[in-house]
Amino acid sequence: FRPLKPGEQYHPLMSPDKNYPEVNLWSVLWGIAMAILFSAASAYLGLKVGQVFEAAIPIAIIAVGVSSAAKRKSALGENVIIQSIGACSGVIVAGAIFTLPALYILQDKYPEMTVDFFQMFISSLLGGVLGILFLIPFRKYFVSEKHGEYPFPEATASTQVLVSGEKGGSQAKPLLFAGLIGGLYDFIVATF
């Protein structure tokens, strides 16, 4: 990823002239499954350690693996949707786990103050939706006009994972090999 030269036009990897599978039952269900799984993991880690992790890269890797295992062709758009739905989990959870305990502590100190779970759920949901809605107007600006000018390492890494998965073959082999080595290392460290 590099800044565009003066007068150079940005050409997206997925051509706007073609029709790709993107938002469908497959991608939405897998995205929701990833959001649930990584929300639980992020909430546990956040409450235990006080820090949440960003789930975009692991979800991108899982999306590529699941699509490859299901032998889905032209799955880049679907994988982007899976990754986008799933990756919101860490952000929403972080907002909730750092504020909800404080509200319950305040309720313990001031019994007249009530904390309703449904209100907290709706406020978290609306916060996520508003965040997406406020970001939509900036999408074209950051993707097309400011392409390569800002170092967004996580977004760049997620994009590389998704593109490598779409190309398959030799591009995806280092990802698989690195994942196996990492899993083996983690197994050895956790077991012995």
Each language-model region and where it sits:
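Alpha-helical multipass membrane-protein architecture
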Residues: F1-F192
